[in-house]
Amino acid sequence: MKFDTVIIGGGLAGILCGLKLTQRGLRCAIVSRGQSALHFSSGSLDLLGALPDGSAVDTPLMALQNPDALPAEHPYRLVGTDNIARLADETETLLATCGPRLRGHARQNHQRVTPLGMLRPAWLSPEEVPVAPIQSQRVCVVGISGFLDFQAHLAAASLRNQGISADTAEIELPELDVLRDNASEFRAVNIARFLDNDDKWPLLFDALQPLSQGCDALYMPACFGLADNRLWRWLSDRLACALYLLPTLPPSVPGIRLHNQLQRQFIAQGGVWMAGDEVKKVTLDNGVVSALWTRNHGDIPLRPRFVVLASGSFFSNGLISTREGIREAVLGLDVRQNPSRADWYQSDFFAPQPWQQFGVITDNTLRPQLSGSPVDNLYAIGSVLGGFDPIALGCGGGVCAITALYAAEQICQRAGGEQ
């Protein structure tokens, strides 16, 4: 099977890269082994929330105008900080065409409310997520009886510590008893599959309407809206106050919705999605990937002109940790890491951890190295890359998006895709 590009990994970076390639008329396939890390995410994306010295960033593009703001190995530096604004704008446009209703802009971070009632900088967030300022609001944080993946009292306590008037309430929704009887089934995704049915919408409205009479905003767990946010908009038009949704413990409804919307658009544009498959072997000829062999296709190789590695970090098994060191799982590419295991971590759990910056080494076109030499038709994108700490710097989503579109640009220029 011949393709212009095969992407290994179906997470945020892989899909965004595939979307741009298929828009440019290239034949593209994504080999996806399992669930994307988006299924475990808040549905918000960050671009740059802090600098290495710990100082907060309010205006990411302005901060990136200083070429020394980030270390030389950071993916933003490899891509070129002068390209970030253009690629961020392109990301926002691309996401909008896929269906997600997101708010925010790369020029200015907003502060989103987290499930614990704290504030965290973000670039893009679903429109139903509450953002600062909220000091003047009387907030009621609403839980669902028996639902353990969202703790309303913890969120309310954090809000009160910030000087916000916050109370809690709980709704019953007896119709959910069929799920409530089994704690392992009483999860946000299963609740959403029930509540997203149009005939169930009034049940939720009837439970929330009395609470909406006595406050300025209701915060409740994001346990509906798997396909879109039509139910949230329907409720917002009818309740007596604003309604906002907070992500729950995984699996996350906003994250799954974002992934599904991007996946549907990729397939609609002619992309091939190989679900539940895994690249088991890679054939290299003179420093060029000539064939990929996957679990499901047996002795039928995929023969791409270009390959994109978007296999993720440790969480997605794109990087593997052993006693001997860190290795990249598919090709054994060169990896940035500290030689001594004692230097992998800080004893303070909440301090920036060195291992977060481990990952594949690339040149400034995002071509990775194998035994010190670049692989000519291979690109690495997203969280498999080394040189950045997505937690401490608040840049995980941005690195995925920016590197995905940048690699797609390199491929289009070389492959002759429509510009």
Swiss-Prot record:
Which pathway does this polypeptide act in?
Answer: Polyol metabolism; glycerol degradation via glycerol kinase pathway; glycerone phosphate from sn-glycerol 3-phosphate (anaerobic route): step 1/1
Protein's name in the database: Anaerobic glycerol-3-phosphate dehydrogenase subunit B
For the keyword Flavoprotein, the answer is: yes
Q: Name one GO biological process term.
A: glycerol catabolic process
Reactions catalysed, semicolon-separated, are: a quinone + sn-glycerol 3-phosphate = dihydroxyacetone phosphate + a quinol
Q: How does it assemble?
A: Composed of a catalytic GlpA/B dimer and of membrane bound GlpC.
Q: Which InterPro entries match?
A: FAD-dep_OxRdtase_2_FAD-bd, FAD/NAD-bd_sf, G3P_DH_GlpB_su
EC class (word): oxidoreductase
Q: Which gene encodes it?
A: glpB
**Similarity-based family:** Belongs to the anaerobic G-3-P dehydrogenase subunit B family.
Q: What does this protein do?
A: Conversion of glycerol 3-phosphate to dihydroxyacetone. Uses fumarate or nitrate as electron acceptor.
User: GO CC terms for this protein?
Assistant: glycerol-3-phosphate dehydrogenase (FAD) complex
Instruction: Show the NCBIfam families listed in the entry.
Output: glycerol3P_GlpB, PRK05329.1-1, PRK05329.1-2, PRK05329.1-3
Q: Which UniProt keywords apply?
A: Flavoprotein, FMN, Oxidoreductase
Q: What is its EC number?
A: 1.1.5.3
One family name in Pfam for this protein: FAD_binding_2
Q: Which GO terms describe its molecular function?
A: glycerol-3-phosphate dehydrogenase (quinone) activity
Domain of life, per UniProt, equals: Bacteria
Q: Which cofactor does it need?
A: FMN
